[in-house]
């Protein structure tokens, strides 16, 4: 293996303290990942609630309490929960693959009789390592395919399902994750960040008056919308499934899920989650600062959308009016604000993870 693509396996390695966070028979189970996952599920539920607005043509009058909650949700939940999910998902896949490889290497080491020639031992372990990497890659890809299947079933009921999105990530990038292809993760992460920025910029442009300025009709403006609008009726399950396909693609290309998942893979190479007590001060200070950055990055986007999902505004639908909204933004600024929101959203997700790890970890 090249230095750029290390497989973190040591022959005959015993689980070290660094990797004992989860299931070792004689090891402490650190609660940080579990607490973060539980809190993340709460944030996902809150983030998905506005999705149901696509089922209603009319909206209830916005109250003061609604407005306050909308501002808090935009600052701390929207575009922050999905990257948090993705980081934990990438982290979990990396740990699962590492443990699979390490178990195979311990078994291969145990199969060697005493006094084995060093050269023969090295060849045996090299073959075992290659087979273990292939096995771990298949394991990750198999998990991904099952997630896509479960996501499709869930998508029949709820078109905004996110399970399939992470299944696609695991299936496509199984080798990258298992073998820690750092350069590939960096390049793909940068490319997908640019794709997400373009996608959100288009939606900001479409929601902020760009189609009218360009002379497009509402139907032309929504031609590239990533959301299929559904309405209750006999065809709803089929409509939801079609909507799920679009929303899965949308999440991959606009929600920073792939870059965040790769961050989670890199996180597995540290002890920030397994031993957060060693980094408590940095996690607390850095986490709080990251949440502030994430909250600040949401302000202009909330002014543009009024807290409504931006895809519901494409085609000329008005944003909910409250003290969070104001005079119409210039088209160029409306195009930029969702980009700022998703980029700072990833920062905010890192903030949540840091604070949760510091709170839940031993110490």
Where are these regions (language model features)?
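Alpha-helical transmembrane segments of multi-pass integral membrane proteins
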Residues: 257, 321-363
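Long hydrophobic alpha-helical segments that form multi-pass transmembrane helix bundles
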Residues: 190-269
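Alpha-helical transmembrane segments and their helix-start/interface "positive-inside/aromatic belt" motifs
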Residues: 25-42, 179-193, 277-290
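N-terminal signal-anchor module of multipass membrane proteins
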Residues: 2-98
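Structural signal for the C-terminal ends of transmembrane alpha-helices
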Residues: 93-101, 175-181, 265-275, 356-363
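Short aromatic-rich membrane-water interface segments that cap or initiate transmembrane helices
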Residues: 67-81, 238-251, 326-344
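Membrane helical hairpin/interfacial module
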Residues: 58-163
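Membrane-interface interhelical connector segments
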Residues: 60-62, 303-335
């Amino acid at each position: 293996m090249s230095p750029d693509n290390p497989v973190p396996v040591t022959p005959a390695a015993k689980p070290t303290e660094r990797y004992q966070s989860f299931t070792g028979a004689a090891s402490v189970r650190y609660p940080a990942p579990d607490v973060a996952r539980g809190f993340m599920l709460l944030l996902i539920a809150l983030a998905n609630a506005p999705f149901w607005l696509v089922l209603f043509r009319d909206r209830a009058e916005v109250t003061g309490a609604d407005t306050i909650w909308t501002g808090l949700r935009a600052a701390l939940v929207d575009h922050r929960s999905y990257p948090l999910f993705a980081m934990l998902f990438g982290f979990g896949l990396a740990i699962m693959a590492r443990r699979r490889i390490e178990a195979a290497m311990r078994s291969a080491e145990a199969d060697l009789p005493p006094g084995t020639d060093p050269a023969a031992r090295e060849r045996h372990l090299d073959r075992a390592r290659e087979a273990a990497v292939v096995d771990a890659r298949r394991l990750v890809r198999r998990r991904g395919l099952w997630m896509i299947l479960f996501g499709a079933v869930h998508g029949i009921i709820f078109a905004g399902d996110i399970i399939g999105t992470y299944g696609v990530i695991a299936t496509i990038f199984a080798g990258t994750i298992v073998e820690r292809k750092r350069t590939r993760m960096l390049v793909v992460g940068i490319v997908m960040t640019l794709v997400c920025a373009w996608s959100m910029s288009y939606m900001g442009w479409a929601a902020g008056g760009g189609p009218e300025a360009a002379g497009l009709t509402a139907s032309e403006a929504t031609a590239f919308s990533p959301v299929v609008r559904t309405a209750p009726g006999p065809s709803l399950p089929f409509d939801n499934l079609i909507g799920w396909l679009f929303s899965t693609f949308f999440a991959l290309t606009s929600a920073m899920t792939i870059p965040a998942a790769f961050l989670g893979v890199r996180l597995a190479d540290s002890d920030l989650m397994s031993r957060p007590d060693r980094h408590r001060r940095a996690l607390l200070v850095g986490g709080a600062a990251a949440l502030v950055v994430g909250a600040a990055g949401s302000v202009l986007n909330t002014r543009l959308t009024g807290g409504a999902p931006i895809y519901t505004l494409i085609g000329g639908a008005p944003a909910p009016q409250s003290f969070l909204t104001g005079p119409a933004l210039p088209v160029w600024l409306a195009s930029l604000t969702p980009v700022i929101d998703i980029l700072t959203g990833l920062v905010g997700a890192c903030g949540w993870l840091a604070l949760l790890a510091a709170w839940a970890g031993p110490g």
